[in-house]
Amino acid sequence: MSSVRDYADLEGKVAVVTGGSRGIGAATARALAAHGTAVAVVGRDRAAIDATVGSITDLGGTAIGEVADCTREEELEALRRQGNERLGPVDILMPFAGGNGMPVATDTETGAHWRQVIESDLTSTFLTVSAFLPMMVARRSGVIVTMSSAAARQAARSSAAYAAAKAGVVAFSRHLAGEFAEHGIRVNCLAPSAVENDRMRAWMSEDERAALGAAFPLKRLGQPEDVAAAALFLASSASSWVTGVTVDLAGGKVML
């Protein structure tokens, strides 16, 4: 038997992916399902959720779709109950739900916008983890992969609120990793830079996207599947000695 671990251990596991109906979340849900993980795809748009679930089940994977607002504790509690009843206890939690980093100048950013972004990107991560963490502690096993952004560490084309929220996710994840390692729970974080998705295509032209991609050492934008590949590694036993880290996915831009 090879001493190099693969992703075979993902087969038979149960994962919850919030923000799972589109972009990075959808790509991650599909990647997990392709390796035999049963996935709960969570989002707010029923049609988008059903499309992602369908793309999984059409290929023989196991997935269910759930509508939930991850800033509402009662909806997350219902999600936990429903997921447990339909798929079983959660082994892998990926709280990817959040807003976007649309550019907002700090001198025009309002308190209302600040609170909304912190709620959608940081508080939602905390509440989602809080809903599922007791189950993992009781089983002394679990993997949590959170979603930050390159904006947490770099001056970026986003907003101060978004940068602060995503930096908060990094700190929260590191704290969780330290606090719950003794319970057999690993916590790591992903920090992607510019990933081409529907949102980006809606507010940037093809030429603008090409110019942005050319600014990266690897001369292209990230794709949702690039981030999903890293999420898959962190979810599997291939990363069994990895916890408390933030993985930068930035096409080499962290070197600049």
Question: Which ranges hold each PLM region?
Answer:
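Alpha-helical segment proximal to the catalytic Tyr-Lys
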Residues: 134, 178-182, 240
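Catalytic Tyr-X3-Lys loop
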Residues: 110-126, 141, 145, 169, ...
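Active-site helix of classical SDR
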Residues: 129, 165, 173
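Active-site loop immediately N-terminal to the catalytic Tyr-X3-Lys motif
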Residues: 107, 154-160, 182-183, 219, ...
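Conserved glycine-rich cofactor-binding loop
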Residues: 14, 21-23
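Substrate-binding pocket helix/loop in short-chain dehydrogenase/reductase
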Residues: 104-106, 110-118, 200, 212
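Short C-terminal tail/terminal secondary-structure segment
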Residues: 2-7, 103, 154, 232, ...
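Residue(s) in the substrate-gating loop at a strand-loop-helix junction
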Residues: 149
